[in-house]
Design a protein with these regions (language model features):
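Short terminal alpha-helical segments
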Residues: 1-35, 91, 95-97, 101
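Short runs of predominantly hydrophobic/aromatic residues within well-ordered alpha helices
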Residues: 3-10, 28, 44-48, 63, ...
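Charge-rich, solvent-exposed alpha-helical interaction surfaces
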Residues: 13, 31-35, 47-50, 54, ...
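Generic detector of bulky aromatic hydrophobic side chains
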Residues: 16-22, 50, 76, 86
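Amphipathic alpha-helical interaction modules
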Residues: 20-63
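Amphipathic alpha-helical binding modules
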Residues: 65-104
Length: 104
């Protein structure tokens, strides 16, 4: 099973939270608000859980393979400094949105 099939909910966020957000939104906060508000809290929780399954114990090579499978057309080195940095950026935004929802 390919990574995008194994961690399907997380994959959806890698498609949405890419390096091109700045082309469509004036700020990162505006992009995140627009991109994640349509997702149910349960989807965010699933994506965070899948993130940890995918990346917590992954080597740099494995992270690169997972990220490349999630979104092969993007080059995370240009915007994020590498695949692991993009993965961390996605996780940080998922967790921040969950926290925002929990605190109201």
């Amino acid at each position: 099973m390919r990574p995008y099939e194994r961690w399907h909910t997380l994959w959806q966020f890698f498609i949405a939270l890419d390096e091109e957000w700045a082309d469509e939104w004036p700020t990162e906060a505006a992009a995140m608000d627009d991109l994640v508000r349509g997702y149910a809290t349960e989807s965010l929780e699933t994506a965070v859980r899948e993130w940890h399954e995918a990346f917590d114990k992954a080597t740099d090579s494995e992270v690169e393979q997972i990220v490349a499978d999630f979104n092969p057309s993007y080059e995370p080195e240009e915007t994020f400094g590498g695949a692991r940095q993009w993965a961390e950026w996605v996780r940080e935004h998922l967790e921040a949105e969950l926290q925002r929802r929990k605190t109201g």
